[in-house]
């Protein structure tokens, strides 16, 4: 079968088109996986580009590789500049007798969270501060319309001093003190000064297990754990807000609450602290 190898340099390139070309899409609706393309061509390319795009994401100084051989298709961005930081990403398909296994990863280091949030429409979820994140997923794939069903992995993020829009913490604490459930939208008219934000999650079959989420703002420490479904966006999270005493710095027990509803319409239900 034919083989193609070499090095290509571009001024500007659409990386989304390359990733689509290396993805095993087939069927009448483009939902089933057609892996026969890995049997028809051997490919080994080194790519570089001064500028590049992948959907809404703009990158510069891109170095990437594309490989196809029997039973394997790989696209790796080994280095790129994005959101005023560095970015690496990869997409891999391993084809075996038992099926197709997909692996994907994204690692961003020392990026501008505000720029990331604006680009992806996540200004309320991503702080305006410097930070890093890592996403790794792997698992069997049968159809594109159910691509996430078998994927498992981790997502973690760490952001430093900055701000988080859409959070009025004093109003939130007052509502939890008053009792009765309320919509998070009711206490979203504010901007929260942020000292740091740390997030660690485990992903299994369309569920995000929030193992640890901690936000520190001045004397307040907000913690969350629980489940988030990214099919439907359902929420089941337990949280607390502790306040450190000014003289000792020790955190005193504070508000406890449950977060339910969905990502688009979360609600808060205050919880009674155990005696």
Per-range role (PLM):
Residues 1-76, 82, 87-192, 203, ...:
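Membrane-proximal interfacial segments on either side of biological membranes
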Residues 201-210, 214-221:
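Extended serine/threonine-enriched, polar tracts that run as long, contiguous segments within proteins
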Residues 195-199:
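Short, intrinsically disordered low-complexity segments
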